[in-house]
A protein has these predicted regions:
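Acidic, PIN/NYN-like endoribonuclease modules and their adjacent C-terminal/linker elements
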Residues: 119-122, 126-155
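Short secondary-structure boundary segments
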Residues: 21, 55, 124-126
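Short, active-site-adjacent cap segments at secondary-structure transitions
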Residues: 24-25, 59, 128-130
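PIN-domain endoribonuclease scaffold, especially VapC-family toxins
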Residues: 42-96
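Short, well-structured N-terminal submotif of metal-dependent ribonuclease cores
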Residues: 1-51
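Active-site neighborhoods of divalent-metal-dependent phosphate/nucleic-acid chemistry enzymes
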Residues: 85-121
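Residues that scaffold the ATP/ADP-binding catalytic core of kinase and kinase-like folds
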Residues: 26-28, 64, 132, 144-145
């Protein structure tokens, strides 16, 4: 996987995002790379989105993407996770209180996103997170990229 250096889009600054594992899974299942989850991952690969992570997120990526039911090639999983580690930012969690999470394993993504000003959390499962403007679907992230004048991210 080729990865570009982070870019700034039309002077609007870098885009930082914690990316939920379901977005990676969905992108790897997209055969033509034009799905919104694929566009989000392509934006990471092109340096348009800087991923935020911590050791728990990386561990979850490896665990979930390596499950036999998905049949993803180990070298593809290693390559994708390596891009997140090499070009992302290892980010501490910001503890949150008084928020409800139906799946406690998702809290780490929320807390990592909360640790960086103006960061997003990109997920295919909005119902797993509090309703906040920074918690967005892959489709919404693609719209954000379009509004910032990001060149094609499907290549």
């Amino acid at each position: 996987m080729q990865k570009s250096k982070p870019q700034e889009m039309n002077g609007k600054g870098k885009i930082y995002a914690a990316i939920d594992t379901n977005v990676l899974v969905s992108s790897l299942f997209s055969s033509d790379g034009t799905s919104n989850p694929s566009k989000v991952i392509n934006a990471v690969l092109k340096g348009i989105i800087t991923p935020l992570y911590n050791s728990e997120i990386i561990e979850e990526y490896r665990d979930v993407l390596s499950r036999a039911k998905f049949r993803f090639r180990p070298e593809l999983v290693d390559s994708l996770v390596s891009v997140f580690v090499e070009y992302g930012i290892d980010t501490p969690r910001t503890s949150v209180e008084n928020e409800y999470f139906p799946d406690i394993d998702d809290i780490v993504f929320y807390e990592v996103a909360m640790s960086v000003d103006d960061a997003y959390l990109v997920t295919g499962n909005l119902k797993h997170f509090p309703k906040k403007c920074f918690v967005v679907t892959p489709s919404q992230m693609v719209e954000i990229l379009d509004k910032r004048g990001v060149p094609s991210i499907t290549d």
